[in-house]
């Protein structure tokens, strides 16, 4: 549960924000995030011993080659660091999918609450050490930003993540 929470609640968001910071356009983030499924399949083979069919190996290979081919576009070549962090985000998400397989028996509300709590605490501690003045920064957030944060918390965390965690109970990575 802790590994899942760190992977999903901390690493995905850290790498997503780093990829946004280091990209001048959104394309590298979209491209890198497409690797979540291939990373998840590879992680399930390594960590859970699942068999990967030759068809899936071909699709995984095609996904990585496709990213390499697309990335020769000159606009994307200047955003390599953004793609790198987006790929790490996809890897973290893929790992969280594998970890979730072991958490099928937990209630999805408990799972979502634990991910949120661990993510909040770890990111808050990291923020204190890296950013300094964390409380001052939180207090200075304007109302429009709080509305966006509320949307993220309600629609994404309570809606989409709960549904995703629910589906993890029934489907393989």
Enumerate the predicted regions with their spans.
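Hydrophobic alpha-helical transmembrane segments of multi-pass integral membrane proteins
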Residues: 3, 59-62, 81-85, 104-157
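Hydrophobic transmembrane alpha-helices of multi-pass small-molecule transport proteins
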Residues: 43, 52-72, 89-91, 123
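A helix-boundary/kink motif common to multi-pass secondary transporters
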Residues: 24-25, 48-53, 107-108, 172-173
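Structural signature of hydrophobic alpha-helical transmembrane segments
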Residues: 20-36, 79-91, 144-154
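Hydrophobic/aromatic residues within transmembrane alpha-helices
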Residues: 19, 46-48, 52, 103, ...
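Specific transmembrane alpha-helical segments of multi-pass solute transporters/efflux pumps
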Residues: 1-32, 69, 153-171
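Hydrophobic alpha-helical transmembrane segments in multi-pass integral membrane proteins
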Residues: 11-17, 68-79, 120-135
